[in-house]
Amino acid sequence: MNVNNVEMVMSAVSAAQYPTDGKPEIALVGRSNVGKSSLTNTLIQRKNFARTSSQPGKTQTLNFYDVENQLYFVDVPGYGYAKVSKKQREAFGNMIEEYITSRKQLRGVISLVDARHDPSEDDVAMYEWLHYYNIPILVVATKSDKISKSKFNKYENNIKKQLGFDSSASDFLFFSSETKYGRDSVWEWITAHM
């Protein structure tokens, strides 16, 4: 998709604050600093539209980005960041659960994992949870520029095995915000789920 118009419409912490215009939504989930904002910036072809940070845990609300007045990207707070209080983690969990389990406009979830590492327990739990709710999932292995393409199959097989990947209900792609590898394939998945 050629993106010319993007607007950060709102940040929300509850259903009462979600957009009401009925556009389809694609949520981006993953642990802190896995690259959700970088993926967003690459997809919309902007360098710093979605704020990236070297400090994990910066996103603390559901951030709705209107893309071409056709759909929303919903940037979800990262999980697994140890310096966030237990109370705050619970609040994030409740906010994410409310959104994902009740939002009719949600067409799919892009679940980001770091291509270089085994999925965390939180990554596995999120994948299982999304799968349980029959939500279309695209697993995106970020930072793929850090591994050799000749090893993609090895890393993909490992990630899928760790997640308990179900190829009948999920898709998998490698992605790099540095090289833009996988950008078009992610857009194809998004378009197919609008």
UniProtKB/Swiss-Prot annotation:
GO terms for cellular component: cytosol. Its cofactor is Mg(2+). InterPro entries: G_ENGB_dom (IPR030393), GTP-bd (IPR006073), GTP-bd_ribosome_bio_YsxC (IPR019987), P-loop_NTPase (IPR027417), Small_GTP-bd (IPR005225). GTP binds at residues 30-37, 57-61, 75-78, 142-145, 175-177. Residues 22-194 form the EngB-type G domain. GO terms for biological process: division septum assembly. GO terms for molecular function: GTP binding; metal ion binding. The keyword ATP-binding does not apply. Pfam families: MMR_HSR1. It comes from the Bacteria. Keywords: Cell cycle, Cell division, GTP-binding, Magnesium, Metal-binding, Nucleotide-binding, Septation. CDD domains: YihA_EngB. Mg(2+) binds at residues 37, 59. Belongs to the TRAFAC class TrmE-Era-EngA-EngB-Septin-like GTPase superfamily. EngB GTPase family. Necessary for normal cell division and for the maintenance of normal septation. This is Probable GTP-binding protein EngB. It comes from Leuconostoc citreum (strain KM20).
